[in-house]
C-alpha cells in the first residue's frame, strides 16, 4: 500500500517577513525574528513554513522583484541567518517553503542590466523584447496587472520590454532554454541547503504567448514544469504549490494530478475562484460585490468534487495579497472571535492542505486607513491613480482598498497589546492596527478559549484523524442560504461539519438520514453539539464538527 505523501497531512503557515517579527528594532521584520518565534509556530502545530521572498531586492514590490536569487536582502539578515532558520525549523519538524518568483526579475538583476547594455548581449533574450508599433507606441495594448501598459520603452535600443507587473519587474523569456537551465540550477542550490520546497509565484504566466496576448496558461507551462520537476524537486520529493490565478479545475489537474506519472509537475496549486467570485467585472477587486453564500458554496463544492480523486486542493482564506479572512468572510466586530473560529473549522474540515496566514490564528482584521498615503502596496497606489483618472470617486476606490487591498494583510503581527521591542511599529511603512488588548498573541496564549487554541486543536485533529486527510467530501443542505454543511466519510466514520456563515440565529432542518444521530463533538465555538436534532437552532456564526462512528 502506497504511503500518504507528507504534504497531504501537512498544515502550512505563511510568514510575510517584513511585518512578522523584528529582532533588532529597526522597524522591519527579519530572519532572526522568525527564528525567535519558531517555538510559537511549533506550539501551533504547523509542519511547513512558507516565507514570502527574502532574497536581495530593491523592494519595488516588497521583495517580489528579485535582483539576486542567491543572496538575502540586508533588511532581513544574512545567508547564515537563513541557513540557521532552515536548521532550527528542521529541528522542530518544520520544513521551509521558499517563495519562487521566476516569471520576472527585478530590473536590477545582473541579467537585465546586461540585457540593457546591447541588443547583442548574451542576456538580451533572457527577457521579452518587441519593436514599437507603427506610431512608436507599445507593441500592443496588453495591460500590466499593476496598471498601465505592460510594455516599457528602452530608449537606448528603441525596443520595448514586457512586464506584467511593475515597470521594474521585467518578464523572463521562458522560451529560452538558458533561462530554464539557470533557474533549475538556482533551485537546486536552495534545495541543497535543506529547504522543503517552493511556493511558485504566478507560475501559470511562465508559458505566456506574447504576440497573441495569451498571458496565462499558454502553450508550454506544463512542458516547462515537467522539465523543472525532473531537474530539481521531483527526485527529492519536495513540496511545490503553484499560484495560478487563472486556473480551472481542469487546469489544476494538469498541474497536479498525482497519478499522471508522465506529467510530474506540481504537488498542488492555489486557485482563486472563491476569492474572485465577488469582484466587479469592470473594476475587479476594487469594486467589491455583496457576498452570496450559495454562489460561494457552489465554487468550493466544484473544486472539492473535481479534485477529489485525482488532484489535491490548497485550502486558504487569505494570504499576503488578500484581505483578512475574518473581515472578508466573517464579522470583524461583535462576532470577531466566533466567526474567526467558524472560518477555521470550515477550512480545516475540507479536503486538502490547509494554509494559515500570519495573524489569522489570532483573528487579525483588515486595516481601514482613510488616507491613500497611509498605504504602501504598489498595486493599490497605482490603481488608485488610474481609477481616479477614469472617473471613480476617491470614496469608492478607498472602499475597494479597505475591502480587498493587499496591505490589509501586511500590517505588523500583533505580538503584544502595546508597542515593545520586537514589534515593528511601521513595518513595512504601515501603522500597527490599534486594537483592544485582546487582539494579540500574548493575550491569546493566556486565554484557553482564544482563536489561537481553536486553530491549535484543528491542527492536532488533522494529525490524529485520517478522515480529515483522506475522507470523501459531500455537501448537504445545499440550498440553505446561510449554512454551509458537508459530510466527510472514510470507512464507517462520518464527520458532519456545520457552519452558520451569518450573524443571525438560523433554523436548520437536518436531513432525514442524519436526524437524531449521536456522536463526538470534535470542535465547536459554542456549547458542544453531540446529537443532530431534526431542527437545530444555530447561533450567530456557530460551527461544529460531529464525528459519528457508524452511520
Curated annotation (Swiss-Prot):
Top EC category: hydrolase
Annotated pathway: Glycan degradation; palatinose degradation
Catalytic activity: 6-O-alpha-D-glucopyranosyl-D-fructose + H2O = alpha-D-glucose + D-fructose
A GO term for molecular function: alpha-amylase activity
Family recorded in the similarity comment: Belongs to the glycosyl hydrolase 13 family.
Pfam families: Alpha-amylase, SusG_C
Alphabetized NCBIfam families for the sequence: PRK10933.1
Keywords recorded for this protein, A-Z: Carbohydrate metabolism, Glycosidase, Hydrolase
TM annotation in the entry: none
Function: Catalyzes the hydrolysis of palatinose. Shows a strict specificity toward palatinose, and cannot release glucose from the disaccharides sucrose, maltose, trehalose and melibiose. Involved in the degradation of palatinose, a sucrose isomer that is formed as a reserve material under conditions of excess carbon availability, sequestered in a form unavailable to competitors such as fungi or the host plant, and whose consumption appears to be postponed until the preferentially metabolized carbon source (e.g. sucrose) is depleted.
Thermal response of activity: Optimum temperature is 30 degrees Celsius.
Record EC number: 3.2.1.219
Claim: Hydrolase is one of the keywords in the record: yes
Protein name, UniProt field: Palatinase
InterPro entries named in the record: Glyco_hydro_13_cat_dom, Glyco_hydro_b, Glycoside_hydrolase_SF, O16G_dom_2, SusG-like_C
Gene Ontology biological process terms from the UniProt entry: oligosaccharide catabolic process
Superkingdom, taxonomy of origin: Bacteria
Induction: Down-regulated by sucrose and up-regulated by palatinose. Part of the palEFGHKQZ operon.
pH dependence, record text: Optimum pH is 7.0.
Active site: 201 (nucleophile), 243 (proton donor)
